[in-house]
A protein has these predicted regions:
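Predominantly a Rossmann-like dinucleotide-binding segment in NAD(P)-dependent oxidoreductases
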Residues: 1-42, 164
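Active-site rim elements
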Residues: 5-8, 114-118, 136-141
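Phosphate/oxyanion-binding loops and surfaces in catalytic or ligand/nucleic-acid-binding neighborhoods
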Residues: 23-26, 81-85, 157-161
Length: 175
């Protein structure tokens, strides 16, 4: 329910949008979002959510979460004239949708493609990094500012969704 999760954009978007911002480090120009409530009346989350992040360089990234679509869409896709990156769901999570890291396929202008290897993580890496930060002051890979900006992008997407997908400029911080 939206009262608990913040809605479909917040529920599913936090990790996906963070992954997108790690792939495209450009400044964000604006965000547009849409929520559709069509079928599942027992829950207050949108049945379908669509977020497009437009960067100042003209690049765009799109995140779609749908509990309606007959075919599962990629987690996200970044399309360009020189190539594209498709972030697909990991089938290891089947039959349910699991928030495993996306399988990244890089598509080149010449029509070739390759799956980008994921960096292996040691078990409990997040917790180890917290201990390292507390005990030794070693910065964590994910910092509060990065997380704060992802939340600001989701807030802008929700605001846009309330205004029929009119683009909204998120309030982001650099430091």
């Amino acid at each position: 329910n939206a009262e608990v999760s913040g809605g479909a954009i917040f529920d599913w978007g936090i990790n996906v949008l963070d992954q997108i911002l790690n792939i495209i480090p450009d400044d964000v120009a604006h965000v547009s979002g849409q929520n559709h409530k069509r079928v599942w009346t027992h829950a207050t989350n949108a049945d379908h959510a669509h977020v497009t992040v437009t960067f100042t360089t003209g690049k765009q990234a799109t995140f779609v979460h749908s509990d309606l679509a007959a075919a599962r869409k990629p987690k996200f896709y970044i399309l360009g004239t020189e190539g594209a990156i498709i972030g697909d769901w990991d089938p290891a999570g089947e039959p349910a949708v699991a928030d495993l890291p996306a399988i990244l396929t890089v598509h080149h202008k010449d029509g070739t493609s390759r799956v980008a290897p994921l960096q292996p993580l040691a078990p409990h890496e997040f917790h180890r990094s917290i201990v390292e930060y507390i005990n030794n002051g070693i910065p964590m890979e994910v910092n509060a500012l990065q997380s704060r900006n992802v939340v600001a992008i989701m807030q802008a997407a929700e605001q846009s969704a309330l205004q029929n997908a009119i683009p909204v400029v998120p309030i982001l911080r650099r430091s």
